[in-house]
């Protein structure tokens, strides 16, 4: 039996407090809103009780943030794309940010199990004055559990329409991509951290973010397989290849905290669920 679940999440500012409202259809929802940083920032945990997707499953996530609202979204655990008998497993996330909105999109990794046939799509639309920090982390198999990614396909699509597009199809049979030093070089975790602005960011602002990312990279064990660029005036990206998820996630969290301090003068404040 396949699932088609849909979540629509809205952030609004009400009496100087960012408030989340949602409606859902199927096994996809958010937990109680938390305010560890005060009323201005609403923290939410997105949960999918079945715990993963098999062939035929579809998850649709629509997020809208209104003017002056600030939401932070994470997940309690990894997303999982399991073995398919032929049908596609699909997750689509669409984020729309109104003028002056801020959003932090920080889900834990997506794990591609051997035999999966999956797509993970993220589309971001930001009006002038809106800003977002987000990341995308993909694990190909579970190397430490002796569960390699030996067959299957995974399509990864991240897009800011008219500004930035990252799209790649990973096939377990493509040994040149997976093993070549011009491809993944044997790494099994692919991760990106990105800053999206609805207004072209000043060069000095982008250079400050790049400098913070590069300083963290230079001090990290992944310095040979990580880099930061600004392909467009509205985008800054940190990309990482790692043998497993943990070191990549450590680097992303470090730079995320540095970026939110630089951009929004906010202290480090990790979602509480990460500590459980």
From Swiss-Prot:
<dbReference type="GO" id="GO:0005737">
    <property type="term" value="C:cytoplasm"/>
</dbReference>
<comment type="similarity">
    <text>Belongs to the UreD family.</text>
</comment>
<keyword id="KW-0996">Nickel insertion</keyword>
<keyword id="KW-0963">Cytoplasm</keyword>
<dbReference type="InterPro" id="IPR002669">
    <property type="entry name" value="UreD"/>
</dbReference>
<comment type="subunit">
    <text>UreD, UreF and UreG form a complex that acts as a GTP-hydrolysis-dependent molecular chaperone, activating the urease apoprotein by helping to assemble the nickel containing metallocenter of UreC. The UreE protein probably delivers the nickel.</text>
</comment>
<keyword id="KW-0143">Chaperone</keyword>
<dbReference type="Pfam" id="PF01774">
    <property type="entry name" value="UreD"/>
</dbReference>
<protein>
    <recommendedName>
        <fullName>Urease accessory protein UreD</fullName>
    </recommendedName>
</protein>
<dbReference type="GO" id="GO:0016151">
    <property type="term" value="F:nickel cation binding"/>
</dbReference>
<comment type="function">
    <text>Required for maturation of urease via the functional incorporation of the urease nickel metallocenter.</text>
</comment>
